[in-house]
Amino acid sequence: MNKIYDKVKECYKQVNEMTEFKPQIALVLGSGLGDYAEKIKIETVIDYQEIKGFPVSTVQGHKGRFVLGYVEDIPVMIMEGRVHYYEGYSMSDVVLPIRLMKMMGAEILFLTNASGGIHRGFEAGDFMMITDQIASFVPSPLIGPNIEEFGERFPDMSHIYDEELQEVIRKSADHLQIDLKEGTYIQLPGPNFESPAEIRMCKAIGADAVGMSTACEAIAANHMGMKICGISCIANPAAGISKKPLTHEEVQQSADRAAPKFQKLVTECICRMGKSLKK
């Protein structure tokens, strides 16, 4: 058997012993957005440290626990704090939580993050629906022997972000009168912020927002046949777009300010997605 698969399976076995909860939607919360989980009807909370072998987030603003419960009547599994490649974890560990949530029963993966705005039309506090991604600057989580239990060797990436879910997000934002941007997200390894020259490169190859997560998670989820959608909270203009130095504190503060609007948007999206799952 494959060691990576065995590790995910062992984590699944442990979580399954802690709860019988079966999520339909998996939600990953980015920097500063973690308080959303406090608003749902909570069924179970599992700290990552309770799961032997599970990677633990070390980043400020990432709590490091699963919250399982209901948004309205939709069963969701929320990651309050993701792990990042720059923390020193292998890419297989970075995407282990995604694979676990799929094993738990989640059909949809809803990714969120705080990112730097590359597009000149973006301002801090804007929301960008991710329509495509660039992940060429970080290792693919699919490198190594293919894990047949998860998916095929060469998965297609033409429509990573599900078009029906994108339409759900558009309608949700329109219903709430939230100005929704759209664009391509690029993941760079971090933990250092990007240089102005790197941002010029990102812009030249078609990126609208930049961050240090998300794209690798989408690759793993796509491999397993999950439906994927994503929203970036534009926390700050990327290097060279603004002349101010970038700090993680600024990212958190900006995400905190956007949180109330973000929470409404996510709730509306999940309710609409849940209805589509029942059809």
Which residues make up each language-model segment?
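Short acidic/polar active-site loop segments enriched in Thr and Asp
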Residues: 107-108, 208, 227
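Histidine/lysine/aspartate-rich catalytic loop segments that bind and position anionic ligands
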Residues: 134, 138, 142-191
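Active-site/ligand-binding-proximal alpha/beta "capping" segment
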Residues: 166, 172-208, 266, 273-277
